[in-house]
Amino acid sequence: MLHFIQKVSGASSKMLKNPFTVRLGAGRIDILSLKTCLLQNFSSLPPRTWLSPSFQVCMRKIQCYHVSPCNFKKQKAVLPPKKRSTITYLLDSPKPALYITLAGLIPFTAPPLLMVITKSYIPVLAFTQMAYGAGFLAFLGGIRWGFVLPESSPAKPDYINLASSMSPILFSWAAILFSERLNEAIVTLIIGLGIALHNELFLLPHYPNWFKALRIVSTLVAFISFVVTLILENIYPEKGPKRPD
């Protein structure tokens, strides 16, 4: 450290002997001679002899760190794959189940279609549509009962599963009781179909996705067919008996 002070004092004395060059025309001080003098004096020092030992140790530790430029670009978040909608599994259905389900929708759609063609409201066709809807709704309850019977089934034969399978049957029974008042019977079936679909999709989600897709399609077709029948009663004139002989 003493050697460093001596060198600095020697440099200061040399700086006094070599004064700054003043450029009067430019109005500024030329410090080139000062830089040259300092470089000559400090270059003659042995490397790092003028540093204290503690400072040298600190410098060695600092040199161990690697500093790289930070990447401030926003990286795109990796989003999870979008879940498929239940209705998209319709084409994954087994062909026999798909074709039989589509054929089973004909009794729902045929009566209002014939009424539109003949431009008349036919109570017999509306009654047959209602009777088929009652049987269809009871069949949905039986599906749930049969689904819980196998030992390997994910749905267990507990009170929730077995009791939920009875609700479609009760709505079917009520619709048959109201068959004298056809409109009330059709509304009862619409409510029963909606409750059954809600239970199967949200409360009892054990069915395969393709079966859920079939249930959505069949319920929508039945609902639209029943609503069209109720509308046609108020549009077209009534024709034929109210019930089959």
Swiss-Prot record:
InterPro entries: DUF3429. It is a multi-pass membrane protein. Keywords: Membrane, Transmembrane, Transmembrane helix. One of its GO terms (cellular component) is membrane. The chain crosses the membrane at residues 97-117, 122-142, 159-179, 185-205, 216-236. The keyword Cytoplasm does not apply. It is found in: Membrane. Pfam families: DUF3429. The keyword Aminoacyl-tRNA synthetase does not apply. This is Transmembrane protein 69. The gene is Tmem69.
